[in-house]
Curated annotation (Swiss-Prot):
Domain of life: Bacteria
Gene coding for it: nagB
Gene Ontology BP terms: carbohydrate metabolic process; glucosamine catabolic process; N-acetylglucosamine catabolic process; N-acetylneuraminate catabolic process
EC identifiers of the protein: 3.5.99.6
An example molecular function term from Gene Ontology annotations: identical protein binding
Official protein name in the record: Glucosamine-6-phosphate deaminase
């Protein structure tokens, strides 16, 4: 696990976008694992700029998103399908048929989970997986005590996650109580992982992910065992780390 510390959120976003762009230049048909939420918005903004500046071409890229809310129509402006179109897909030349999210509206949700996992494997696996991290160190929607071997599955969201996501909805009651998420086992199959975090409220989660015991109580801690994980954080999120353990960029 390598840790890169940037001055602020914009610096973190630019560094992550640089790494994604470099991956696409190196392998134009890269398979990207993408995340939603407020953390990667700046990264997507910078990737769109790189596309507009003819630095990166998404025409052969394929993507698989980490998660989607359960039984929230994709037409809803809080669905992750909607988020991805608004923040990235509608602004670059990625082919719609090459973008994939779990279908939270599927009638047979267990079959959908198995099919989604199989689709990732059939594509050749994820080259670079982007992750955010929750205050409780959840990755994807894998909450504390999720088994590390878990593959794509239906998740009951914790009260803290519902509370954190309530700011995106009209009211707390509107936040879905379940989601479909890649499992930790799915995430660990990725060839490279970029974990992004910003803000002082993420400092404990980052500390426990980097230094803590590897335990399901801290889902991010399993990334210590991944062969190529890069943690990209701003100074506030890195505030509890020992400076000798990271590189300022």
């Amino acid at each position: 696990m390598r840790v890169l510390v940037c001055k602020d959120y914009d610096g973190m976003s630019k560094k992550a976008a640089e790494m994604i762009a470099a991956q696409i230049v190196l392998k134009p048909n890269s398979i990207l694992g993408l995340a939603t939420g407020s953390t990667p918005v700046g990264m997507y903004r910078d990737l769109v700029k790189k596309y507009n500046d003819n630095i990166v071409d998404f025409s052969d890229v394929m993507s698989f998103n980490l998660d989607e809310y359960y039984k929230l129509p994709i037409s809803n402006d809080q669905s992750y399908d909607y988020f991805m179109k608004e923040n990235l897909f509608n602004h670059v030349n990625i082919k719609p048929e090459n973008t994939h999210l779990p279908n939270g509206m599927a009638d047979d949700i267990e079959k959908e989970c198995m099919n989604y996992e199989a689709s990732i494997d059939a594509a050749g696996g994820i080259d670079v997986q982007v992750l955010g991290i929750g205050r409780n160190a959840h990755i994807g929607f894998n909450e504390p005590d999720t088994k590390f071997a878990k593959r794509t599955h239906v998740v009951e969201l914790t009260e803290s996650t519902i509370e954190a996501n309530a700011r995106f909805f009209k009211s707390r009651e509107d936040v879905p109580k379940k989601a479909v998420s890649m499992g930790i086992g799915s995430i660990l199959k990725s060839k490279k992982i970029l974990l992004l975090a910003s803000g002082e409220e993420k400092a404990d989660a980052v500390y426990n992910t980097v230094y803590g015991d590897i335990t399901p109580e801290v889902p991010g801690s399993i990334l210590q065992l991944h062969k190529d994980t890069i943690v990209i954080v701003d100074e506030a999120a890195a505030s509890k780390l020992n400076p000798k353990d990271y590189k300022l960029v």
